[in-house]
Swiss-Prot record:
InterPro entries: KsgA/Erm, rRNA_Ade_diMease-like_C, rRNA_Ade_Mease_Trfase_CS, rRNA_Ade_methylase_Trfase_N, rRNA_adenine_dimethylase, SAM-dependent_MTases_sf. It is found in: Cytoplasm. Keywords: Cytoplasm, Methyltransferase, RNA-binding, rRNA processing, S-adenosyl-L-methionine, Transferase. Its EC number is 2.1.1.182. This is Ribosomal RNA small subunit methyltransferase A. One of its GO terms (biological process) is rRNA methylation. It is an enzyme of class 2 (transferase). The keyword Methyltransferase applies. One of its GO terms (molecular function) is 16S rRNA (adenine(1518)-N(6)/adenine(1519)-N(6))-dimethyltransferase activity. It catalyses: adenosine(1518)/adenosine(1519) in 16S rRNA + 4 S-adenosyl-L-methionine = N(6)-dimethyladenosine(1518)/N(6)-dimethyladenosine(1519) in 16S rRNA + 4 S-adenosyl-L-homocysteine + 4 H(+). Coiled coil: none annotated. The gene is rsmA. It comes from Mycoplasma genitalium (strain ATCC 33530 / DSM 19775 / NCTC 10195 / G37) (Mycoplasmoides genitalium). Specifically dimethylates two adjacent adenosines (A1518 and A1519) in the loop of a conserved hairpin near the 3'-end of 16S rRNA in the 30S particle. May play a critical role in biogenesis of 30S subunits.
Length: 259
């Protein structure tokens, strides 16, 4: 593929550093997955290692040029290759009676939607390479400048672990920022509720505003004050001052108690 030009529209930045590829593979191998679903096969740099695990594998690729290359070069079979947009795929349909590990180098523009689809699915673990800044927001501490609605949402449902940081020079074409490999593991003790995410978006809508002011267009102020006080919180509290668990407790009390 000497004449191949990465697509800016698809956000293609291929991992070309062999040391990084081997580190990712070693980490995935240590997780001892039952099966693998790789998002964005690309030219198959990581794929060639993942196939050595000799476990069920599916690779998702949207670029028709790469699909042809992967099949012509016999890197993947028709059965192993899933063609099309990952956001239009049912994550639960890849394997029956198996819980595959999801992994991939994801374009920044679709990282949040993919994580949401992962949360909605039955899959339990996701090894994700993403922009360093995005990873920082996912892992941000309460009351920090990076703490956000989506970060709090993910932290409530997931255990998020930084695996290692990856320099931008490990990719071709070289992106403007460094990347981070993270592991997302679902917390078994909580059930997914997408409406919690909608609630958080409103809570964090204007960070400098008090929580009550961000929610008063949806709930009566007296009603909000009563619930906040029952949670032993100050009435001037802001969303970014609350932990994911505190925010979920407020969500349950505010939304479930609404007449």
């Amino acid at each position: 593929m000497n004449s191949f030009f990465p697509s800016r529209k698809l956000g293609q930045n291929f991992t070309v550093n062999l040391s990084v590829i081997k580190r990712i593979f070693a980490f995935v191998k240590n997780l001892n997955p039952q099966a693998i679903v790789e998002i964005g096969v690309g030219k198959g740099a990581l794929t060639n290692y993942l196939l050595k695990l000799k476990i069920p594998y599916k690779g998702i690729e949207i670029d028709k040029r790469l699909i042809e290359y992967l099949l012509v070069e016999k890197i993947l079979t028709e059965d192993q290759l899933v063609k099309g947009d990952i956001l239009k795929k049912d994550f639960n349909s890849f394997f029956e009676n198996l819980s595959p590990l999801l992994c991939g180098n994801i374009p920044y523009s679709i990282t949040s939607p993919i994580i949401n689809k992962f949360l909605e699915s039955k899959l339990r673990s996701f090894v994700l390479m993403t922009q360093k800044e995005f990873a920082n927001r996912l892992l941000a501490k309460v009351n920090s400048s990076d703490y956000s609605a989506f970060g709090a949402f993910c932290q409530y449902y997931l255990t998020i672990t930084t695996v290692f940081k990856i320099d931008r020079h490990a990719f071709k074409p070289k992106p403007k920022v460094d990347s981070t490999l993270i592991l997302l593991e679902k917390n078994k003790s909580v059930s997914y509720d997408f409406k919690f995410g909608l609630f958080l978006k409103q809570c964090f809508n204007q960070r400098r505003k008090m929580l009550i002011n961000n929610l008063k267009h949806f709930f009566a102020v007296d009603y909000l004050l009563n619930i906040i006080q029952k949670q032993n919180l100050k009435t001037s509290i802001r969303a970014q001052e609350l932990s994911p668990c505190q925010l979920f407790n407020l969500y349950q009390n505010i939304c479930n108690g609404k007449n």
